[in-house]
Amino acid sequence: MATFIRFTAPLFCFFFLFSLFSHQTMSQPQHMATFCDDRLSDNFTQTSSYKANRETLLSSLRDRSSLGTYSNATIGLSPDTVYGMFLCRGDLTKTSCSDCVKTATLEITKNNNCTSRKTALIFYEECMVRYSNVSFFTLVELDGPYVAKYSLATFPTSLFSSFQQTLSNKVEQLIILIASKSSLSASTPYYVKDISRVNELEGSYTLDTVVQCSPDLDPANCGVCLRLVVKGLSGCCTNARFAQFYLSKCFLKYDTTGLPTSQSPSGSSSINVMKGEHNICPRL
């Protein structure tokens, strides 16, 4: 016999509001960093055509964010042209992507350092949004902003040296694979996830790797960008068990499971975030 539960109006409202609040809390995009060009020559006034074009561009990106994980737009005539784009993580639902882009396009203009800047870039774990008065489409910036998020738990010493080569080899494999997903007609362009079992004499573990490039890059530049990320990881978090590294045109995330437990100085579950105006890769 079926069992039915009758909700009174107040109780139903409580559960409805609780579920709504929980959904909003869980889906809240996680901000990582905001970068703005601090050159005085790249300022604009609040009554300028550039400001109006920027608002139109950000609104356009918000509107397009429900259609896919990437879009770019160009608004206005020179010298007030604004170029912009968004890129969502490839495993997000359309709703989560749209939520992140909407949040990012609103927050980027609220940042005190970005209010009057012609160039800005905002990173969330789920997406990134940027705009500029100079076109950046199809380009890999070798010295642009970066964000790294990584665990303070480290690899056992016996596996440390071999892991870097394992990760580098894995990324090279995925660079070849990702080229086949470069078309904008693909369900998720330039996004590949791989789960592999790594067997070493010193121990075995599972390596979960995700790579993604902005679809405006060609396959060759996508590879350049991802190789820069690997070098960037070696400059910040070379022996971390988990890491995410973001450049303006590509992203890499890896996680390892099945290794013996080790403690970092702050605890094995501690996470650190490193960011900078200039990519650490070229200095390696």
UniProtKB/Swiss-Prot annotation:
CDD domains (alphabetical): Gnk2-like
One Gene Ontology CC term in the entry: extracellular region
Keywords of this entry: Repeat, Secreted, Signal
Statement: the UniProt record of this protein carries the keyword Disulfide bond: no
Domain Gnk2-homologous positions: 32-136, 151-259
PROSITE patterns registered for this protein in UniProt: GNK2
Signal peptide annotation: 1-27
Record's subcellular location: Secreted
Family indicated by similarity: Belongs to the cysteine-rich repeat secretory protein family.
Protein's recorded name: Cysteine-rich repeat secretory protein 8
Organism: Arabidopsis thaliana
Gene that specifies this protein: CRRSP8
